[in-house]
Amino acid sequence: MAFDGLVTKSVVYELNNSLVGGKIDKIFCPSSDEVLIGVYVSGIKYALNINISSANYRINLTTNTKPNPLVASNFCMVLRKYLLNTRISRIYSLGLERVVVIEFEDLDMSDNFTTKKLIVELMGKHSNVILLDDCDIIINSLRHLYTCLLYTSPSPR
């Protein structure tokens, strides 16, 4: 089945109903193009699977866990640094594009709320997962992008 804008909207609707308000308790990257995020919501544990392989790109909830590599990738370590123990505040898609935005909230040292965004671009061989700060500046990405630049979404087709 093709993963188009309508399917993206449906998946985002389901993720929104299941994960908003959930606390991030685990993050690991079983392969170079996959991220698994453990989310704890109302006594239920979910695993959010993000896969950006060119042939099998997707974002979904899963019960299957894969073995965790002994050494975590740089991107995985950055995700853990910024997203562990945060809460999912909102999940949405950009129009009818295959771009999913997951917003996380956390308190900083001075008890102010900070927001981080995880952008999931589901575009075949151009798929990517990008971590942004509260000013939409790129912190890191799964596939190489220049960091410290302002994120701009892909142009609509």
For every predicted segment, state its role.
Residues 151-156:
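Conserved small/polar residues in nucleotide/adenosyl-binding loops
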